[in-house]
Amino acid sequence: KKFFNKTSFGSILLKPTIIYVKPLLKIIESINLKALAHITGGGIAENLSRVLPNNLGAVLSSKELDFEKNNSIYKWLNYECKVDTKEMLKTFNCGIGMIIVVSKKDLEQTIALCKTIKQPVKYLGKITNSKKEVVFN
């Protein structure tokens, strides 16, 4: 209960998945996307590296991930079940279901558009010249 406040564990597990098709279609109409990564099994690093060219990687902020926040199944797994943070990042999406890669010049417009269409959005980090390496700081 201390991780979920008044929400039951069952309710959290039964929360429906987000369907991204409609919001992504609206974003694609307005923004020149560089890549999309649907974060599924394999976690953030594996799924993001799949959509990046061989000469690019990424540096992401772990502070934006749900296992750092309250009311999170990921925080519960991390702390109560003692799942190591590195293992969390390799295995789970940690609350990030989709990553949109855009050029720096399109960043603010992308964030504004996501807010307009009521799609939660977080700035996770930046693309680097690190040859498919995705790291968290």
Features from the language model and the residues they span:
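Glycine-/charge-enriched secondary-structure boundary and capping motifs
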Residues: 2-137
